[in-house]
């Protein structure tokens, strides 16, 4: 066990244009090979496309999509007496948002389409409406947790 104190939880910074923490979290997850300016370009293009598609505030669409994909509960593999059980555990809001962003980006990358901005905007609009691969992933996780409710006492 570590003798050092627990690390302070860092507050997420907000992005320069929209002053939104979710946008910055999205940028940091989409980042590849340290190319942050390219990540910002992709996000801002996706936000513009959302604005064109829905004709509403794109940040509210983003918030709605992330809220829709954020899981309340997940499963964790736990080894008990030689067999591995999927134990359902509740997750906090920060970890839930991080998972939601990861699932949204994975679903966007899988989508067929021209470029990442187009694919991301389509996935975000679908998630805000309650459909799409990311929503399906959340429902699948919740189903797994529900199926393994009997192992909840192994926590």
From Swiss-Prot:
Coiled coil: none
GO biological process, one term: translation
Gene3D superfamilies xrefs: Ribosomal protein S7 domain
Domain of life: Eukaryota
Residue intervals passing through the bilayer: none
Annotated keywords: Chloroplast, Plastid, Ribonucleoprotein, Ribosomal protein, RNA-binding, rRNA-binding
GO molecular function: rRNA binding; structural constituent of ribosome
Cellular component aspect of the GO annotation: chloroplast; small ribosomal subunit
Family, as annotated: Belongs to the universal ribosomal protein uS7 family.
Assembly notes: Part of the 30S ribosomal subunit.
HAMAP family, A to Z: Ribosomal_uS7_B
Protein name (record): Small ribosomal subunit protein uS7cz/uS7cy
Species whose genome carries this gene: Coffea arabica (Arabian coffee)
